[in-house]
Amino acid sequence: NTLLGLAIAIILALVAALVGPLLIDWGTHRSLFEAEASRLIGVEVRVTGPIEARLLPTPSLTLHDIEIGNGGDSKIRARLLGFEFALGPLMRGEWQASEVHLVGPALGLGLDASGQVRAPNLAIKFNPDNLSIDRLNVEDGTVILSDAANGAHATLQGVWFNGEVRSLLGPFKGEGAATIGGELDPFRIAAGRYTEDGALKLRVNVDPVNRPLSIVADGALTLAGAKPKFDGTLSLTRPVEIAARSATQSGETVSQPWRLSGKIKVSTASALMQQFEFRYGSEDQGLKLTGVADFQFGKRPHFDGVLSGRQIDLDRALAAADGTRPPPAAAIRRIAQLAGGAFRPAIPIQIGIGIDQVTLGGNSIANLRGDISTDAGGWNLDRFEFRAPGFTQVKLSGHLAVKGAGVSFTGPAAIEAGDPKLLAAWLEGRAATAQGDVRPLTLRGDVTFGSDKFAVERL
């Protein structure tokens, strides 16, 4: 909006010169342009490069090497800003830009120690509704984001955007992409009109190129008070088509879709996700969990959440296309591989889990409780316990490590089985044989379990 305001100011001065010659050395009038632009947007404006203008047959203006602001992190720069206006509306006093081309914009957006946005303090002196843009093209932009409270920063490079703007107050829409941390993230954006109370209805879709994921945020962005807030919904999805493509690229035989969605409140310090729902697998056969989550931003971001469910059916969720299902031991290993591979986050995560009943191997696991957290090598399990077939109570803690397609667990475990033969038959996916003398089994030790090893130490 700042750069658009600058061009409005300069085009006003240009139209005022319509009675002059058609070919003018506009560079000699540089100080006039800068003074008028500075007056209209309330901050210092400099145009250090060439100025090219054409009045007929189509009014157009091209500026090179633009600087806006009084210095510091809030200064805005651009290598080129070009305008082309529709002649008919211009003669009627309407500013309808048929095309605006912006090359190399660079700006910094940050939060000070109190969480307020640091940006140029503009005081625009024209009506924003007087400008509409049919085609807005931005290329090779750079945006530097920073937070003074904790020193965190991020850089968006190679930003491009193509869209249309009905007014500087909205609505507007378009698509583009930005490179963040070496990864390309295409996006689509649509916004309503900026209201008097400082709110903007906004919908953003992000489809990262290097991650099998689709992100959608839809809600109201409040900009009043220099502390932005977002209140709406967030959806993180790996839909069927992305799951299939991911499986092909990774060599997997099966790759299930999943979705995490819910209400979200975002401030400059945190994001609180309320009443969210996690689904894994298809709509008719997948499992569903609900919960709440709190994501704290900053130099050391972390994610804390709680997942709960009354009853989930892993037999249906993990069944193959022909309906066959893996035995419980293989299913547990597969779930561990999925947790370490598909859900390997880039930030620390801690999640509490509580599920009343899980159907697996045609039988039930009851009262599954525990905490999981992440580290560089996988997941940590803390105070996990559940009841399994064979009148079995299982308690374990330890580390679930994932390397490539392999998974291993190391940690202390305690098993109390009233019918160990029934427990073994269930784990192997076979029918229980006729029972003779059944004796309970109590087992404690440090367990190591992997694709090619099972060992118990200090038994």
Q: Can you say where each PLM-predicted feature lies in the sequence?
A:
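Intrinsic, low-complexity N-terminal interaction/targeting segments
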Residues: 246, 328-335, 339-343, 360-368, ...
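Short, low-complexity cationic-aromatic patches
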Residues: 261-271, 299-300, 344, 360-365, ...
